[in-house]
Amino acid sequence: MTEYESAQKGALKLKGCGDMSLGKKKKKKNKANDQIMQEIITSKKNEEEKKKPSLDKRTPAQLAFEKMQEKRQMERILKKASKTHKQRVEDFNRHLDTLTEHYDIPKVSWTK
C-alpha cells in the first residue's frame, strides 16, 4: 500500500488556473488606453480643421472629362427615371416579340 499512498486523491488541477472554479475571468479596463484613444480622436479632429483647402491640380482636359461624365450620368438617371417599371417591362416584351424563335423565352409579367 505504500506505493499508492503517494498518489494524489481528489480532482485534477490545471496549471495556471488557480482557484477559478466560479466562471470566466474578469477583464481589466485599461484607463490609459481610453485616454490615448480620446487624444487620438481629438487630434484627428484638430488636424481636419487646420487643413488648408488644397489647390485643384487637374488639367483642363481632366476637368472637361469629369464634367462630361457627370452630364452623361445625369442624362442616364433622367432617362431611367422617366419610365415606370411597367413601361420598361412592356418595352422588353415588345423587344422579345421581334426576336426569332431561337431566342424564345416566356414574356415577363409586370405584376410579379
Curated annotation (Swiss-Prot):
The species this protein was found in = Xenopus tropicalis (Western clawed frog)
Keywords, sorted A to Z: Apoptosis, Cell cycle, Nucleus
What protein name is recorded for this chain? Protein FAM32A
* UniProt-listed GO biological process terms: apoptotic process
Q: Where in the cell is it found?
A: Nucleus
Family, per entry: Belongs to the FAM32 family.
Q: Where is this region: Disordered?
A: 15-35
Q: Which GO terms describe its cellular component?
A: nucleus
Residues in the signal sequence: none
Q: What does this protein do?
A: May induce G2 arrest and apoptosis. May also increase cell sensitivity to apoptotic stimuli.
| Pfam families in the cross-refs | FAM32A
Q: What is its main location?
A: nucleus
Domain of life per record: Eukaryota
